[in-house]
C-alpha cells in the first residue's frame, strides 16, 4: 500500500527542504511540485569528496537527481518555459536523465515576458519602505492573470491560432498598464508570440494529465512525495500579508495544485531551521543584528551561509519563533517536524526562543494575522543554555550534546508537534531519524 508525504516549509522559506526531499526520495517513486514557480530555490549536495556534486534547482522537483524517480509539475505551478528548458539542459549536461522522467501539467499558467516586466516595474515604483522584495520573475502577475481568468496555459501553446487571439487580448491590457501607469516599455506582440510558440514542440512530450498520473501511481502502490516551495509564513492567505508570495504554500495546496484528493495525503512533514530567517521586506519579531561580529545573528548568517539561492541577497536572521511555528503547525496539520541547521547554533552560549509576543500591552501566543499587527509585536523570550560541542554530521540522537537535546525537546513542546528528523549538515547521511515519514 502506498504512503504519500507532503513536505512543507513552516517559516519564511529557505528552511532546507531540498536536502530533506532528496533524502526522503530514497523511499518514493515520484516527487511532485504543486505551487510557486522558479522563484523557489533548492540546493542539493550529493556525494562526498572529489565526487561531490551540487545541484541548484528552481522548477524541476528535487527527485530528479535520483535514478528512476518520476517527477511531476502540477497545475498549481506557474511555468516559465524558458527557465524550465534551461534547467533541463543543465541537468542533462550534468549527466542526469530528465526528459523521460519529468511530466508537466497542461494546466500550468505560463509566465511570459510581460509578467516579468510588470513585476519589476511595480517593485521599482514602490516606496523603499513598502517594497515586497519580489524576485522579479513574473510570479505574482502570472497568478493575477490566473485568478482573473486571462492566463495563457501550457495547453494553449498546442493551438496556435487560439493562442494568438488570447495573447493579443491580454497583451493589449498589460501593455496599457506598462506604458500608461508604470512608464515601462511595451512588449512586442509578434516577438512574444513567436517566442512562446517556439517552445510548444519542446514542451509537448513532457505534458501529461498530472491528476490522472498521480492517481494511477498511487493505485499501483507507489509512494509519492509532494514538495512544497517557499514557506507557510509567505502563503498568500495565511502569511504576513502583503509581504507574501502569490501562491498558497501550505499542505492543503498539495491537493488543489495537483488534482489529487486530500485523502491521498497521509503525512505532513514541516521543515524548520533551528533558528529563523527571512528574505526581503516584512515584519520579523525575533530578528537579530547580522552585521556585528561575535553576535548570535552574525554567526547564524555567516556559519549558516544565509544567502538566497535565487535572490543572492543576505537573509535576515533571528531566534527561533515558536509562536509563529505553532501557527504553521495548525494551518498545515503537521504530523512531524524536521529541524535543520542545528549545527549552526554550536558555540552560542545562550539560546533564546520566542515563546509569544506582547501586542499593545497584551500577551499573544500565536503569530497574528496580517503584517501590521506582526510589526507591532514585541517578542517574549525563554532562554536555554547552549553547547560548545560540535553537532555537525551527527546521525544518532544519543550522540548529541545534552543541551542540544534539551533545546530540541523544548522546541517540540512549544510547537506541539513531535520532532521526527534532525538535520546536522547538508549531506544525506548527516541526519538523525527519530520517526521516518514513510514508516521505514
Swiss-Prot record:
It is found in: Cytoplasm. Pathway: Purine metabolism; AMP biosynthesis via de novo pathway; AMP from IMP: step 1/2. GTP binds at residues 13-19, 41-43, 315, 341-343, 423-425. One of its GO terms (cellular component) is cytoplasm. Substrate binds at residues 309-315. Mg(2+) binds at residues 14, 41. The active site is at residues 14, 42. Its main location: cytoplasm. Its cofactor is Mg(2+). NCBIfam families: PRK01117.1, purA. This is Adenylosuccinate synthetase. The lineage of its organism: Bacteria, Pseudomonadati, Pseudomonadota, Betaproteobacteria, Nitrosomonadales.
Amino acid at each position: 500500500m502506498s504512503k504519500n508525504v507532503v513536505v512543507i516549509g513552516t517559516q519564511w522559506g529557505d528552511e532546507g527542504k531540498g536536502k530533506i526531499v532528496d533524502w526522503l526520495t530514497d523511499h518514493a517513486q515520484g516527487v511532485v511540485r504543486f505551487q510557486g514557480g522558479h522563484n523557489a530555490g533548492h540546493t542539493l549536495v550529493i556525494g562526498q569528496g572529489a565526487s561531490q556534486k551540487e545541484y541548484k534547482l528552481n522548477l524541476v522537483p528535487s527527485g530528479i537527481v535520483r535514478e528512476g524517480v518520476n517527477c511531476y509539475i502540477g497545475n498549481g505551478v506557474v511555468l516559465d518555459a524558458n527557465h524550465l528548458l534551461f534547467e533541463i539542459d543543465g541537468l542533462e549536461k550534468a549527466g542526469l536523465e530528465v526528459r523521460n522522467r519529468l511530466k508537466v501539467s497542461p494546466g500550468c499558467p505560463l509566465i511570459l515576458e510581460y509578467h516579468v516586466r510588470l513585476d519589476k516595474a511595480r517593485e521599482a515604483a514602490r516606496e523603499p519602505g513598502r517594497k515586497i522584495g519580489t524576485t522579479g520573475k513574473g510570479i505574482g502577475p502570472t497568478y493575477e492573470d490566473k485568478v482573473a481568468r486571462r492566463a495563457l496555459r501550457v495547453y494553449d501553446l498546442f493551438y496556435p491560432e487560439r493562442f494568438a487571439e488570447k495573447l493579443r487580448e491580454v497583451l493589449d491590457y498589460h501593455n496599457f498598464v506598462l506604458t500608461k501607469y508604470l512608464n515601462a516599455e511595451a512588449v512586442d506582440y509578434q516577438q512574444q508570440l513567436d517566442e512562446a510558440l517556439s517552445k510548444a514542440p519542446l514542451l509537448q512530450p513532457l505534458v501529461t494529465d498530472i491528476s490522472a498520473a498521480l492517481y494511477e501511481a498511487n493505485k499501483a502502490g507507489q509512494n509519492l512525495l509532494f514538495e512544497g516551495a517557499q514557506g507557510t509564513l509567505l502563503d498568500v492567505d495565511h502569511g504576513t500579508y502583503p509581504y507574501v508570495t502569490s501562491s498558497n504554500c501550505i499542505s492543503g495546496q498539495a491537493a488543489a495544485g495537483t488534482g489529487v484528493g486530500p485523502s491521498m495525503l497521509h503525512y505532513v512533514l514541516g521543515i524548520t531551521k533551528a533558528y529563523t530567517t527571512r528574505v526581503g521586506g516584512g515584519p520579523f519579531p525575533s530578528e537579530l543584528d547580522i552585521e556585528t561580529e561575535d553576535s548570535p545573528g552574525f554567526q547564524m548568517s555567516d556559519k549558516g551561509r544565509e544567502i538566497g539561492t535565487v535572490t543572492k541577497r543576505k537573509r535576515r536572521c533571528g531566534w527561533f519563533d515558536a509562536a509563529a511555528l505553532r501557527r504553521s503547525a495548525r494551518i498545515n496539520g503537521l504530523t512531524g517536524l524536521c529541524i535543520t541547521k542545528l549545527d549552526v547554533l554550536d558555540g552560542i552560549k545562550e539560546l533564546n526562543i520566542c515563546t509569544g509576543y506582547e501586542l499593545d500591552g497584551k500577551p499573544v501566543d500565536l503569530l497574528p494575522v496580517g503584517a501590521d499587527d506582526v510589526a507591532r509585536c514585541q517578542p517574549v523570550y525563554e532562554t536555554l543554555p547552549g553547547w560548545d560541542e560540535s553537532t555537525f554530521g551527527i546521525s544518532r540522537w544519543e550522540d548529541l550534546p545534552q543541551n542540544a537535546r534539551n533545546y530540541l525537546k523544548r522546541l517540540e513542546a512549544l510547537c506541539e508537534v513531535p520532532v521526527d528528523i534532525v538535520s546536522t549538515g547538508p549531506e544525506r547521511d548527516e541526519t538523525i531519524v527519530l520517526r521516518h515519514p514513510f514508516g521505514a
